[in-house]
Amino acid sequence: TTTTHMGFDKDFILIEKDSDIKKIENILKKFLLIKVGKKESEYKVKSLDFDLLKKIILLGDFILIEGDGSKNLPLKAPKDNEPVIIKETNLVIGIMGFDSINKKIKDICHRPELVSKLLRKDLDEIIDYKDLVEIAQHENGLKKNVNCKYKVIINKVDKEENLELCKNIANLCKKSNIDVVFTSYR
């Protein structure tokens, strides 16, 4: 589910009220993984009421809640009221796209002005691997409002020649006690 808004697709189970909890319990008897949300529009789901969300949390072994989206862009910095992390959270995973490296801030970032400010770079400047580390470890970056265990996923590491750069990123993050996982879905 989400604490903000996210794209709606046919796989979401829409719930509105407490009586829908029984529906979720029955579905979980058949499926190990479900997506739950409250319909906002034809294209979006929004956050559940907090009381309803707390009841859903009790149903699952593992609940993944999107707390801050990036409009399908590989990098962002959160605005003042983001991310929305509920106090029951025990792990926050910050996600960035490796494909942002060697691209201009203004072209590759959601809220580029905030990324520019965080990195102390102009909007026309290029993102490098050290910028990913800075965003991962900065209190106004992916680590904002985090009061629990924290890890980072850098996805879209799709070429073997990028592995050395990944080692550099991992070593820099390790100095800040941040575990990083690199992924590729190709």
Describe the predicted segments one by one:
Residues 1-2, 34-38, 63-67, 94, ...:
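General beta-strand structural signal in soluble alpha/beta enzymes
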Residues 1-43:
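N-terminal phosphate/diphosphate-binding loop that engages ATP/GTP or pyrophosphate donors
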Residues 2-5, 178-186:
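Beta-strand->loop->alpha-helix junctions that form or flank phosphate-binding loops
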Residues 43-58, 68-176:
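Conserved catalytic-core segment of NTP-binding enzymes
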